[in-house]
């Protein structure tokens, strides 16, 4: 899939690397120490959950800025939100994120007040049918396909993604991935990238585990 020039606005073009390597996104970072784990393993995207107190991975904008400051410049910063308000979107835009990953509804704006950073639209197995609603939306840089409960560590039937037409936009597969099943997932779906959170956390669910991150990346690149 050619994923060059997937999002354009009047100020900049965003290009996704089109080499054959599967992109890697580690989501739900909560500390600068975890950012360093990503640096050591040369991942592509770092996700931070904002404005969603129901999540144990929810952090403040100030905490996110500290994490972003610890990330290598090559790692794309992704704000992960659920049906954000336009005021929350504006805070994200002003904080240095490269992408905004939106679960739920995208806020409506007037043309002159358009969202200024690329959007990754997230879908779970219960709303994959709404993909068509966003297929021709020029604001969308890519899609994240997840299980019915994002961040739960549960997988879904990967064959469901076969029904999604492939286009020039980035396709990330999430939902229950871990070092043991990620190769199988890549071979089944052929996504542009994979997205993981709980699968690389400590056994007690508190924080990311550097060994699991290493094993996850190694499984993909082996």
Per-segment meaning from a language model:
Residues 1-222:
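Conserved N-terminal beta1-alpha1 strand-loop-helix module at the mouth
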């Amino acid at each position: 899939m050619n994923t060059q020039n997937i999002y354009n606005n009047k100020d900049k073009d965003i290009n996704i690397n089109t080499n054959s390597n599967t992109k890697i996104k580690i989501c739900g970072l909560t500390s600068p120490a975890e950012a360093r784990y990503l640096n050591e393993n040369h991942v592509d995207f770092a996700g931070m959950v904002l404005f969603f107190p129901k999540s144990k991975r929810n952090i403040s904008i100030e905490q996110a800025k500290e994490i972003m400051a610890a990330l290598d410049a090559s790692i794309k910063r992704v704000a992960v939100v659920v049906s954000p308000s336009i005021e929350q979107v504006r805070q994200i835009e002003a904080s240095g994120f490269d992408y905004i990953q939106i679960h739920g509804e995208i806020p409506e704006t007037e043309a002159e007040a358009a969202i200024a950073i690329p959007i990754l639209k997230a879908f779970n197995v219960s709303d994959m049918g709404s993909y068509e609603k966003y297929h021709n939306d020029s604001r969308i840089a890519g899609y994240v396909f997840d299980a019915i409960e994002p961040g739960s560590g549960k997988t879904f039937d990967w064959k469901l993604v076969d029904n999604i037409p492939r286009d020039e936009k980035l396709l990330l597969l999430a939902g229950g991935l871990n070092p043991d099943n990620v190769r199988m997932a890549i071979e089944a779906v052929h996504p542009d990238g994979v997205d993981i959170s709980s699968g690389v956390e400590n056994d007690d669910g508190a924080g990311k585990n550097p060994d699991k991150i290493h094993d996850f990346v190694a499984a993909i690149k082996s």
